[in-house]
């Protein structure tokens, strides 16, 4: 209804713009009557006629529409008033369409336009609709004429208010627009000023950069010119240097060719002289063997002090007519070929080791390849050992001194640099060290290594043969790295829990030959670990001592010399060499001190385990393990421990001279107590050397610890000391034997005295507990340390000792052919100053 009314209103306004028709929503009160003419008497006649005509036409039209029964516009509640004619339409309607605000009222014209008023009849529709809607209502009573006046005044007030509001609104809008435009202009001015400033700065920077670029281009051009000039100078200098070098190379080549010819001539002459010398020595040896009688055992033992004499026993792996020492050494091509072979096999083994680490399950595929490679290398190793330089009579192992003052750089056995000065066979050492790592990782490979055969020869057999030849060589000192790698390989093979009898023999022979090479202290570190591993295999421990005769050993305490032969006991040789390994009165270097701690710890543990689970050669010596059926065993033991040192020492000396004949008579009271007398009569001193070497090693460890101001290795020294106090208590208190002080008596007593004093002084620092202190107290109160060394020894002992050894060596150096067969009277030895200087005045041999 509102939209329809709005359309009709717009149409009426367009047709008659000058007629002001106000249509408002009717209120609840009844609208005033439409036909009230009282309020319009003051209008003109034309207006009255017009309004009457409009009312009449509206009534007629309302009746017609009523008859039709349709009502299109409901204006029953609306009120239509005609206040006055105005330029534009003024009114308020309720519509949903938004219209612009009405324009301000215009000035009324001075004259009425009747044509415009009566031009169109459409405006009468509004009156007809109004009359039709309002007809059913009851006509109200006529009011006074003041209603028209009130309506006119309200309309005028509304117009005035609307005009004022519109003017104020337009004024405010204009002010806002003007203010907005001014602000916008100011912002644009500021932005323009900033842009002009930035433009100026950019221009300045561009000018500066352009200048810098020009300078850099000039410098670059200048440097390029200098570079080109320097290149030309270098090319000229290089050409000149090449010409000079070519001249010098040509001259050097001529000199080398001349030297090669001269060297070949000298080598030929030298080879000829060696061949003649060999023939001459053979003839001399044959003539001497015819005239010389069988040597006496004593003379045979004394002869071991000379390098040119031997024990008259051939080595199974060497031929007496081996003339390799008199032949010209292999040329450089053969040496290079062998080195390349070792390097090639080393690369293959490293590749196999890497695959084994990546895929441990591939050991089945890699096992034959690794063993085949090892067979080739060991075959070449045996050939290499044959080419070394060694003496003709290979009966006596040489002495290989080692300098404890030189600086060493120990990284790893597999490192490619040299571990020793003038080291040889470095690729072979690296190959064997890598093989040791593989065997330690895979037990199947170590087992296969002992069973694999190459050309009907076992791998370990070839290694033993090569090490035997290497031990007699003059170049053994240059192969200490190789020996250390072989010892590491042996230690890996000994880790196997169950060893076959054949494999035990091979491993023992390999261990023996490695010890007999008199290696460096670094090799002894691995050897001490091997001896610890042997404790798990009783069969190997039984092979340590073979009861070798006395003439297989020579021990010189004054000169620190220890000589032995191929038939010597392994344990005695190992213990004797270990005593001489770290003899030093000055502080060792830190690396050598740590090495001493490692070797000392391993050896003390080995000796202590030997007494905890004693093998046969120790059981035969211990007095508490004699025959159980002998009732006098305890008495014999007490008698033996209570016998004076001079009596037992006399028997020991006589036994060493007369090959046991006098020893049987002197030691007769103790034959029923234990079997040690029989053992000593046979000449083996494995038990004595094992005990004395433990004392010496412990003394060296404590002595070096004191020299290092008790700041380095305290934990290791404490652990060694706690084990050693148990060991020394067993050796010198529980199972004490007088034979321990037969040789080097005062030296051993001196070592023991110093060890006990150091332990007592630093017991807390070494971690001694009550059991250790009790055992230490027993050692201090033992009968072998009745007086300090400076009160017990005679002042002339060192002089007599040295003079006696000089006399023995001087007599041994004499060439005696027939006189050597004369037997020496043992009784004359009792009058010598050497033995009388070993005891106190009241216990002399006289």
Swiss-Prot record:
Tissue: Highly expressed in the oocyte and nurse cells from stage 5 onward and in embryos prior to during nuclear division 14. Then, it decreases to background levels during interphase 14. Weakly or not expressed in stage embryos and imaginal disks.
Motif EEXXXDL motif location, chain numbering: 504-510
GO biological process terms held by the UniProt record: DNA damage checkpoint signaling; DNA repair; female meiosis chromosome segregation; female meiotic nuclear division; imaginal disc development; mitotic DNA replication checkpoint signaling; reciprocal meiotic recombination; regulation of syncytial blastoderm mitotic cell cycle
Assembly and binders: Interacts with ATR/mei-41.
Residue stretches of biased makeup (Low complexity): 144-162, 655-676
Keywords in alphabetical order: Coiled coil, Cytoplasm, DNA damage, DNA repair
Outcome following mutation: residue 141 to V: In strain: MW27
Gene this protein is translated from: mus304
Outcome (variant: residue 409 to Q): In strain: MW56
Stated consequence of mutating residue 109 to H: In strain: MW38
Family assignment from sequence similarity: Belongs to the ATRIP family.
Stated name of the protein: ATR-interacting protein mus304
Domain remark in the UniProt entry: The EEXXXDDL motif is required for the interaction with ATR/mei-41.
Mutagenesis or variant effect for residue 647 to Y: In strain: MW11, MW27, MW38, MW6, MW9, NC303, NC304, NC306, NC322, NC335, NC336, NC350, NC390, NC397, NC732, NC740 and NC774
Function, in words: DNA damage checkpoint protein required for chromosome break repair and for genomic stability during development.
UniProt key word Lyase: no
